[in-house]
């Protein structure tokens, strides 16, 4: 039986153009659960699931902002917002997956672990916050908040001013031993949601930091920790492409890790979207993973069988 870590993209939870109601998100999650159930039952895989949380954290920060302004309820820090949305999305995925498996006559234990991700307090990202989060403000309000709260703010593409936070590299997960133990006991585990809650270690203690960790890079670290055979990133396109959007665009099928590294260094993959996915795939195969896959959520089973998507191998 092979072990696979599946990193779900945002489209598994919220589609473009949707408002983000609970009903919309749950319907998307139910469709995703069918794909995961197919993988578990048809392919006989041990599955660990991770997921994004960008839109949900964004909405939660807006809720907290409004609550503070209207009702005087203190807003919670970013790391707490990350933990809250891990619980929210993990609950939805877990429930949908249990229900889907039961429909097929299968009882399997599913557990969501609110996960802390260790980062280096000396990571250069802390000196260069770059990840926009939360609501848009006018310039005066943004600069006032920056002064009051110690935030870094930037103008975001002419749409207003926003807070930016660091995006440090993940080093590992505090709960890794628990996750491994559950997987070994036959649990389907949902972990490291949204890249996990970023924490640093100071004088032997863990401390949450206000940052955002890329969920695919954190998912890759999780795949190493559980000693996965395959790391599969599911998104809204059917793989990675070079010369994307140009006349000579070429979608990558089976590709060696050395070829993919060359394309990555040549700048073919956009920083905020495909770039981290490709980097995560490279890291996993270089670590010793059998194969990394980047593919469309709708074709997950075929991609795992190697029939579609970008298949990253050693040679």
Curated annotation (Swiss-Prot):
CDD domains: AAK_CK
Keywords, ordered alphabetically: ATP-binding, Cytoplasm, Kinase, Nucleotide-binding, Transferase
Superkingdom of the source species: Archaea
GO molecular function: ATP binding; carbamate kinase activity
Signal peptide: none
Catalyzed reactions: hydrogencarbonate + NH4(+) + ATP = carbamoyl phosphate + ADP + H2O + H(+)
The keyword Cytoplasm belongs to this UniProt entry's keyword annotation: yes
EC number assigned by the record: 2.7.2.2
Quaternary context: Homodimer.
Name of the protein this chain belongs to: Carbamate kinase
């Amino acid at each position: 039986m092979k072990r696979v870590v599946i990193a779900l993209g945002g489209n598994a939870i919220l589609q473009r153009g949707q408002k983000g109601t609970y009903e919309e998100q749950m319907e998307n999650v139910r469709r995703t659960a069918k794909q995961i159930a197919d993988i578990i039952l048809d392919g006989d895989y041990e599955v660990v699931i991770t997921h994004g949380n960008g839109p949900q954290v964004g909405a939660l920060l807006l809720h907290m902002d409004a609550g503070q302004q209207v009702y005087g309820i203190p807003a919670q820090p970013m790391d707490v917002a990350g933990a809250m949305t891990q619980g929210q999305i993990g609950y939805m995925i877990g429930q949908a997956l249990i229900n889907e498996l039961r429909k097929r006559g299968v009882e399997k234990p599913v557990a969501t672990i609110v996960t802390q991700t260790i980062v280096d307090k000396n990571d250069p990202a802390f000196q260069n916050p770059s990840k926009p989060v939360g609501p848009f403000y006018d310039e005066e309000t943004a600069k006032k908040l920056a002064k009051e709260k110690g935030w870094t703010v930037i103008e975001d593409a002419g749409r207003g001013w926003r807070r930016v936070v660091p995006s440090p590299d993940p080093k590992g997960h505090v709960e890794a031993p628990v996750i491994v133990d559950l997987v070994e006991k036959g649990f389907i585990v949902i972990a490291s949601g949204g890249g996990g809650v970023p924490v640093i270690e100071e004088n032997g203690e863990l401390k949450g930091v206000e940052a955002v960790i890329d969920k695919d890079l954190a998912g890759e670290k999780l795949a190493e920790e559980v000693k996965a055979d395959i790391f599969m990133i599911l998104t809204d396109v059917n793989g990675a492409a070079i010369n994307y959007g140009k006349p000579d665009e070429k979608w990558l099928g089976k590709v060696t890790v050395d070829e993919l590294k060359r394309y990555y260094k040549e700048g073919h993959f956009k920083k905020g979207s495909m770039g981290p996915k490709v980097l995560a795939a490279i890291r996993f195969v270089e670590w010793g993973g059998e194969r990394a896959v980047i593919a469309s959520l709708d074709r997950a089973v075929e991609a795992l069988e190697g029939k579609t998507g970008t298949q990253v191998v050693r040679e």
